[in-house]
């Protein structure tokens, strides 16, 4: 094995990322060295690349970015037993402390001291990445690497959608970014009676339709509340999966929900949000759920079962672009345009 590798690095505060030749990571006794075969771009990566206020307050350069990964194990620490050389793996990117009360209660996704791969530690937009053994997930080898790499964000969709019963329910998904779009086939496979997808981006709406959405709603052209009620016998949606973080979409989702509906909130608003809690939530008996990350490891087992039941094949259209590390600027520009599904970086792909 060579001693160096190519990696996309955030070298200093400010926009952009630099492709550098750096040493291949060394691993400790409980670490795993993974040769990265595919790494999909997440909204978090875009925030770090563009260097928004959140990134400026959280990320400490220099740092190799990227966290949604799939690859092959090429070396393991002497105490590692969870995987072996040659295994195909992905990673749970939340590195938890195992010491706080939430970890002690088995709520690892709510760890008080979480560190994130590619945000707080060197990440996966590189030819190799070192991952703690406790974060390794061994994949079925018949799943393409690009679909293995999107399991982490898919876990967010699964956690949000399956945090309550969907059987025979009407479901409204507000926000058709990749996670919102992933929620469409998840809800369908979970037995939803009808799945309605809402976004102002026509490209993303059509992609949601390709993945199985029954109704596509563009709130700039239609009244979403009226549309939802027209498909739900005038009552409103049984379940709202809020994936956008957009204040207007959140309010529309609440108004489009039936009395007593479940509202699962994953999208992060960029500013404080004003709601009429009395009229829109309390008096209507809505059940609001804040969703963060994936349950460790319950959600990963759910994803595996769904993949084996056919979800992997259904998600193929979501991966719209495959690009080499050298094209990170073009990849981020494309992501910012909103005219893509999931963009996957492939280190072995030639520019």
UniProtKB/Swiss-Prot annotation:
Residues annotated for Zn(2+) 2 binding in this entry: 97, 100, 103, 111
Protein EC: 1.1.1.103
Manner of cofactor binding, per the entry note: Binds 2 Zn(2+) ions per subunit.
Catalytic site positions: 44 (charge relay system), 47 (charge relay system)
Keywords on record: Cytoplasm, Metal-binding, NAD, Oxidoreductase, Zinc
Pathway noted in the entry: Amino-acid degradation; L-threonine degradation via oxydo-reductase pathway; glycine from L-threonine: step 1/2
Marked site (Important for catalytic activity for the proton relay mechanism but does not participate directly in the coordination of zinc atom) residue numbers: 152
Cofactors: Zn(2+)
Binding site residues for Zn(2+) 1: 42, 67-68
Gene Ontology MF, one: L-threonine 3-dehydrogenase activity
CDD domains: TDH
Pfam family, any one: ADH_N
GO-annotated biological processes: L-threonine catabolic process to glycine
Catalytic activity: L-threonine + NAD(+) = (2S)-2-amino-3-oxobutanoate + NADH + H(+)
Subcellular location: Cytoplasm
Residues involved in NAD(+) binding: 179, 199, 204, 266-268, 291-292
GO CC terms: cytoplasm
Family: Belongs to the zinc-containing alcohol dehydrogenase family.
Subunit structure: Homotetramer.
Described function: Catalyzes the NAD(+)-dependent oxidation of L-threonine to 2-amino-3-ketobutyrate.
Protein's UniProt name: L-threonine 3-dehydrogenase
């Amino acid at each position: 094995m060579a001693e160096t590798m190519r990696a996309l690095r955030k070298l200093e505060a400010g926009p952009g990322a630099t492709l550098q030749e750096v040493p291949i990571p060394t691993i400790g006794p409980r670490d795993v060295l993974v040769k990265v075969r595919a790494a999909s771009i997440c909204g978090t990566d875009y925030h770090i690349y563009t260097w928004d206020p959140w990134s400026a307050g959280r990320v400490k350069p220099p740092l190799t970015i990227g966290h949604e990964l799939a690859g092959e194990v090429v070396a393991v620490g002497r105490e590692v037993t969870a995987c072996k050389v040659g295994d195909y793996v992905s990673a749970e990117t939340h590195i938890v402390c195992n010491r706080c009360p939430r970890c002690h209660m088995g709520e690892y996704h709510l760890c008080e001291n979480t560190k994130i791969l590619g945000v707080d530690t060197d990440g996966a937009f590189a030819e190799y990445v070192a991952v703690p053994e406790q974060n390794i997930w061994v994949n079925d080898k018949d799943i393409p690497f690009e679909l293995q790499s999107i399991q982490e964000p898919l876990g967010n969709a699964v956690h949000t959608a399956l945090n309550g019963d969907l059987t025979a329910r009407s479901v409204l998904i507000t926000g058709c970014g990749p996670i919102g779009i992933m929620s469409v086939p998840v809800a369908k496979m979970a037995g939803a009676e009808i799945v309605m997808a809402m976004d102002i981006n026509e490209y993303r709406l059509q992609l949601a339709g390709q993945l199985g959405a029954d109704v596509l709603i563009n709130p700039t052209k239609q009244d979403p509340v009226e549309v939802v009620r027209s498909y739900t016998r005038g009552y409103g949606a049984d379940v709202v999966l809020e994936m956008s973080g957009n204040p207007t979409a959140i309010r529309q989702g609440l108004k489009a929900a039936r009395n007593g509906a479940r509202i699962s909130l994953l999208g992060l608003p960029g500013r404080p949000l004003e709601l009429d809690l009395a009229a829109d939530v309390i008096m209507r008996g809505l059940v609001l759920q804040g969703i963060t990350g994936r349950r460790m490891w319950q959600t990963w087992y759910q994803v595996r079962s769904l993949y084996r039941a056919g979800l992997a094949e259904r998600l193929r259209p979501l991966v719209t672009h495959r690009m080499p590390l050298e094209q990170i600027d073009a990849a981020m520009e494309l992501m910012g345009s909103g005219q893509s599904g999931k963009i996957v970086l492939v280190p072995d792909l030639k520019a």
